[in-house]
Amino acid sequence: MAFTLTNKNVIFVAGLGGIGLDTSKELLKRDLKNLVILDRIENPAAIAELKAINPKVTVTFYPYDVTVPIAETTKLLKTIFAKLKTVDVLINGAGILDDHQIERTIAVNYTGLVNTTTAILDFWDKRKGGPGGIICNIGSVTGFNAIYQVPVYSGTKAAVVNFTSSLAKLAPITGVTAYTVNPGITRTTLVHKFNSWLDVEPQVAEKLLAHPTQPSLACAENFVKAIELNQNGAIWKLDLGTLEAIQWTKHWDSGI
C-alpha cells in the first residue's frame, strides 16, 4: 500500500551516518512533520544542514547508543512520544563494519536493532491499545549472500532480514508492519574502514571498492522510494542505483 510521508513523524536511528545522512535529506524533501534523529555522536553542522533543507519540518536530535538496555530506550521513546503524540515510522539504521570487534558488531547491527524495535512495540502494539506503525530496518546485500571474508558483519545482516520477515508476519497480531532495505556496496567512509575477520583478507575494503559501487545519494533516493512503496515483508535490494524486491526462497516451513 503506497504511503505518503507528508506530515508524518519519523524516527531515524543513525540518521547522520553516510547513507543515513543522505536519506535524511531525501526525507525532508517529502514535507514530513517531524524528523527525529537518534545517533551516538552529535553532529551540529549536519543537523543545521538538515534544518536548512526544509524549514517546515521540525528536525530534532537525541543522543542514542543502540547498545543500551531496553529500559533506557523505552525511557527515551517515552520522551519522544510525549512530545509528538504519534510516531508513524521507525528507521533502524545503526551499523558498523568491523569484524575485528565481534561483540560490538553483533550488539550494534543486530541486538540493538531488535531492542529498539522491541521498545517501540510498547507504544505501537495494538494488543496494548497502540495504533500500529511501520518499521524500516536497514540490512545489506550481504544478508542474502555473505562476503565470506566478513562473516560476522554478514551474519548480522542475515539476522536482520530474518527478524524483519518475522515482524512482517506478526503484523496481524501487533498492527506493526516491517520491511528491510538492503544496500549494495555504497561509497561511504564506512566502507574504507571495512576489515576482515581474523585478517583473512587484509585488503577487503580495497578489493570491494575495485568493483562497481553506488553513490550514497543514489542509494538514499531508492531508500525513500521503498518507504513510500510501503510493502509489508518486502526485502528490498538497493544496488548500483536500482531498487528491486527480492523473492526469498522457502526451503522449510515450521507448520505453525
Swiss-Prot record:
Substrate binds at S140. It catalyses: a primary alcohol + NAD(+) = an aldehyde + NADH + H(+); a secondary alcohol + NAD(+) = a ketone + NADH + H(+). Pfam families: adh_short (PF00106). NAD(+) binds at residues 12-35. The keyword Isomerase does not apply. Its EC number is 1.1.1.1. The active site is at Y153 (proton acceptor). One of its GO terms (molecular function) is aldehyde dehydrogenase (NAD+) activity. PROSITE patterns: ADH_SHORT. GO terms for cellular component: cytosol. The keyword Oxidoreductase applies. Keywords: NAD, Oxidoreductase. One of its GO terms (biological process) is behavioral response to ethanol. It comes from the Eukaryota. Homodimer. Belongs to the short-chain dehydrogenases/reductases (SDR) family. This is Alcohol dehydrogenase. It comes from Drosophila simulans (Fruit fly).
